């Protein structure tokens, strides 16, 4: 396990502690400043609108209670948001399970109560202007305010996963006022749409709750245009208030890595050690912000922000500042690559003949992984060593020429360096004897989790009956069950696909499940690329330049792994073998020829694939001449040469 200086720091200087204090400050500013001022403004406007209908002394007496009621609404919502706020994706494989998981939860009930209370309080404050329902339609007014409006907003809140804070790798800081102003138009449009939907939903609720009432009650209500208009306006104001509170909360919680113009790690007396503790933090929000700061330092126009990385005097048993930063970034990238590859292996076609298994060329994934895990080797910290033996990929035959020097491509960069040595024979067995599989094989060839569970349940029922009738049968039951339950997904070599996945496979949701925190991956790529390019002129003799080979190697493997997922089409699960077994160069070249495939990047893994490709190209173009003196992996050199040829030919569409 890669060690970080987190344990060497005073607990109050860790990134998580400092960032927690910053979040508390932002939350307090949100409550005591923004929402308090907005409550006063809302109360003043409502009092002015109600002045023709109510006496001045009555409005004066209601002024303070109205402010407290409006403040209570905002406080209820943001406290609930704080408790359920998250930055990682939940990991649902498709939209159906996502919606069911969101709606069938305690969180949905909590929000239902919060929004119902908020709707009642807002209607009480607005009642001085729009009234609180006449004698003829008061039951419908209560139903609309207490149930319809909060339910509609709660449904859209959970379906859109409004509790998740969204970030991008382009903006590392955004002022809250700018965040809110950019979304004012969307707030208004969304509120109007939800208000109209609520009016159409109201008859359904009235049919359910007032089915035994006389029809004349509903007729007298619907025939009053003023009553319907009042409900429409009240619901719109309530939706605007709810949406503004949620947007303001998002704006203050997603400000970024700056606090009062300073980087969060600079609030500590040991900035680099604090930053490193954030990169390896357990809390996702802390890690995300730390990677934001690292990318901000790497791309900033101010070289003083990168000077501590170049010249930090901090050293530990695991290395200096840069080596620890490099370890964390490559670790983040490679873990995501491994998850993607393991998933693609899990949906492989289980078929394949013994003859075909010797004829396919495995150019990418198998040299990185063995049995779904990153391979390891006793390699140096930076760079790779050539090996006299390497897995052969041509016609399944080993090249026994002792004078042929081949490049080893099965070692992982800076990961699993302390693992035990593997058996070499198992690697060759994978290439020669493993059943050839395709990533887009029909999922109906798999035994689903549902069918496996049903089979085991029936067998357990049979064992129970047999044990009751024949007591001696019980002696074998426990051993049989332990053997049978190995067939479940967690202990199986056979890929298990849930029955819901058969009905509805969402590539976007699957990408969110595989890479739940893509912004950390993206900021890792941005940070490594920025530091490599900036250090060429700012620190030409430093250690960052020496790691260009390892970074290019990791990016090339990302292009292979993430590119496989970008090419994967769950709607047509029938790719040919040559479409799935391609090198990174083949993958990038076809994507450059097919503009549509580059534009259709709705899932985050495809976006990360394009980002990795762009970063690889930018580094290669920047280090063009210097790469001649750097040892490069064979696949890295091949892809780099192809990029340079394309760039020299002046074909912009190819890149």
From Swiss-Prot:
Q: Which positions, given as ranges, span the membrane?
A: 34-54, 59-79, 89-108, 110-130, 191-211, 225-245
Q: Which residues carry this modification: Phosphoserine?
A: 401, 412
Topology check: give the Cytoplasmic ranges: 1-33, 80-88, 131-190, 246-655
Q: Which Pfam families match?
A: Ndc1_Nup
Q: Tell where it localizes.
A: Nucleus, Nuclear pore complex; Nucleus membrane; Cytoplasm, Cytoskeleton, Microtubule organizing center, Spindle pole body
Q: Which InterPro entries match?
A: Nucleoporin_prot_Ndc1/Nup (IPR019049)
Those parts of the protein on the Perinuclear space side are 55-58, 109, 212-224
Q: Membrane topology per the record?
A: Multi-pass membrane protein
Q: Per UniProt, which keywords does this protein have?
A: Cytoplasm, Cytoskeleton, Membrane, mRNA transport, Nuclear pore complex, Nucleus, Phosphoprotein, Protein transport, Translocation, Transmembrane, Transmembrane helix, Transport
Q: Which additional comment does the entry carry? A: Present with 3030 molecules/cell in log phase SD medium.
Q: What does this protein do?
A: Functions as a component of the nuclear pore complex (NPC) and the spindle pole body (SPB), probably by playing a key role in de novo assembly and insertion of both structures in the nuclear envelope. In SPB duplication NDC1 is required for the insertion of the cytoplasmic side of the SPB in the nuclear envelope, thus allowing for the assembly of the nucleoplasmic SPB side. NPC components, collectively referred to as nucleoporins (NUPs), can play the role of both NPC structural components and of docking or interaction partners for transiently associated nuclear transport factors.
Query: Could you give the subunit structure recorded for this chain?
Result: Component of the nuclear pore complex (NPC). NPC constitutes the exclusive means of nucleocytoplasmic transport. NPCs allow the passive diffusion of ions and small molecules and the active, nuclear transport receptor-mediated bidirectional transport of macromolecules such as proteins, RNAs, ribonucleoparticles (RNPs), and ribosomal subunits across the nuclear envelope. Due to its 8-fold rotational symmetry, all subunits are present with 8 copies or multiples thereof. NDC1 may form a subcomplex with ASM4 and NUP53 at the NPC. Interactions at the SPB have not been determined.
Stated family: Belongs to the NDC1 family.
Q: Which PANTHER family match?
A: NUCLEOPORIN NDC1
Protein name according to UniProt? Nucleoporin NDC1
Give the originating organism. Answer: Saccharomyces cerevisiae (strain ATCC 204508 / S288c) (Baker's yeast)
């Amino acid at each position: 396990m890669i060690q970080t200086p987190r344990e060497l720091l005073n607990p109050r200087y860790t990134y998580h502690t400092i960032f927690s204090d910053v979040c508390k400050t932002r939350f307090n500013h949100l409550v005591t400043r923004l929402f308090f001022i907005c409550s006063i403004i809302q109360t003043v406007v409502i009092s002015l609108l109600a002045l023709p209908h109510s006496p001045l002394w009555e409005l004066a007496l209601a002024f303070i209670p109205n402010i407290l009621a409006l403040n209570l609404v905002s406080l209820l919502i943001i406290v609930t948001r704080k408790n359920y706020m998250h930055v990682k994706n939940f990991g649902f494989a498709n939209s159906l399970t996502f919606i069911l998981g969101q709606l069938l939860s305690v969180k949905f009930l909590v929000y239902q109560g919060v929004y119902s209370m908020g709707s009642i309080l807002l209607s009480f404050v607005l009642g001085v202007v729009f009234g609180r329902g006449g004698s003829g339609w008061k039951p419908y007014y209560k139903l609309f305010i207490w149930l319809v409006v909060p339910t509609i907003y709660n449904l859209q809140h959970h379906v859109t996963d409004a509790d998740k804070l969204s970030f991008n790798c382009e903006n590392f800081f955004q002022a809250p006022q700018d965040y809110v102003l950019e979304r004012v138009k969307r707030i208004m449009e969304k509120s109007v749409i939800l208000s109209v939907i609520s009016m159409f939903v109201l008859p359904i609720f009235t049919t359910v709750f007032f089915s035994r009432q006389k029809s004349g009650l509903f007729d007298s209500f619907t025939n009053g245009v003023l009553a319907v208009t009042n409900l429409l306006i009240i619901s719109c104001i309530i939706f605007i208030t709810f949406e503004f509170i949620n947007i303001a909360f998002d704006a203050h919680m997603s400000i970024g890595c700056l606090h009062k113009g300073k980087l969060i790690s600079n609030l500590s007396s040991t900035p680099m050690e604090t930053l490193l503790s954030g990169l390896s933090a357990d809390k996702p929000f802390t890690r995300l912000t730390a990677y934001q700061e690292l990318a901000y330092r790497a791309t900033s126009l101010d070289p003083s922000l990168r000077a501590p990385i170049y010249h930090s005097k901090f050293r530990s048993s695991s290395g200096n500042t840069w080596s620890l930063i490099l370890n964390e970034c490559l670790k983040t990238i490679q873990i995501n690559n491994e998850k993607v590859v393991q998933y693609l292996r899990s949906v492989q076609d289980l078929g394949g003949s013994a003859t075909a298994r010797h004829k396919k060329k495995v150019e990418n994934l198998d040299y990185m992984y063995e049995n779904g895990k990153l391979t390891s080797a006793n390699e140096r910290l930076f760079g790779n060593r050539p090996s006299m033996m390497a897995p052969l990929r041509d016609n399944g035959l080993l090249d026994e020429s002792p004078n042929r020097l081949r490049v080893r491509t099965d070692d992982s960069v800076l990961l699993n360096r302390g693992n035990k040595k593997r058996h070499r024979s198992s690697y060759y067995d994978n290439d020669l004897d493993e059943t050839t599989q395709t990533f887009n094989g029909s999922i109906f060839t798999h035994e689903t989790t549902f069918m496996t569970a049903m089979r085991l349940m029936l067998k357990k029922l049979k064992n129970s009956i047999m044990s009751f009738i024949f007591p001696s049968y019980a002696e074998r039951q426990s051993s049989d069950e332990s053997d049978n339950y190995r067939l479940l997904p967690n202990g199986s070599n056979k890929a298990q696909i849930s029955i819901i996945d058969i009905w509805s496979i969402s590539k976007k949701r699957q990408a969110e499940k595989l890479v739940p925190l893509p912004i950390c991956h993206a900021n890792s790529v941005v940070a490594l690329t920025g530091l490599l390019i900036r250090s060429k002129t700012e620190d030409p003799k430093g250690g960052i330049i020496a790691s260009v080979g390892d970074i290019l190697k990791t990016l090339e493997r990302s292009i292979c792994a993430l590119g496989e997922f970008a090419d994967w089409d769950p709607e047509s699960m029938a790719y040919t073998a040559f479409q799935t077994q391609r090198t990174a160069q083949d993958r990038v070249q076809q994507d450059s020829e097919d503009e549509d495939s580059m534009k259709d990047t709705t899932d985050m893994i495809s976006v990360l694939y394009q980002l990795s490709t762009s970063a690889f190209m930018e580094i290669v173009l920047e280090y063009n001449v210097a790469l001649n003196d750097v040892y490069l992996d064979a696949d890295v050199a091949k892809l780099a040469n192809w990029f340079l040829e394309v760039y020299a030919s002046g074909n912009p569409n190819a890149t």
